[in-house]
């Protein structure tokens, strides 16, 4: 297994799919990385040599991935909560942030139902 950005990349998959195992790298970003390096997206990771893997590592290093990206996202949410703005309040109460209705749905965000005490 190749190791890129601190993540073990599966050898038996295509390079495009394998790169998506890195947090912050989706299909589009993976295709851009492989295009910049000059590797066909359908190439298996096991067929790549060390120089190609080093080139991929250099390209991935230009993006914010893994721990840095997670920290950035959590700091953005913390900033909204500290400001006390509408979005921050919704984050604090574990409710949907982007305007979805909560009368009937939003069970994923609200958590399991609580029984009524009569």
Swiss-Prot record:
Positions with biased composition (Basic residues): 106-118
Any one Gene Ontology BP term: translation
Cleaved signal peptide residues: none
Taxonomic superkingdom: Bacteria
Protein name: Small ribosomal subunit protein uS13
Subunit structure comment from the entry: Part of the 30S ribosomal subunit. Forms a loose heterodimer with protein S19. Forms two bridges to the 50S subunit in the 70S ribosome.
Example GO molecular function: rRNA binding
Organism field: Psychrobacter cryohalolentis (strain ATCC BAA-1226 / DSM 17306 / VKM B-2378 / K5)
Gene Ontology CC: one annotated term: cytosol
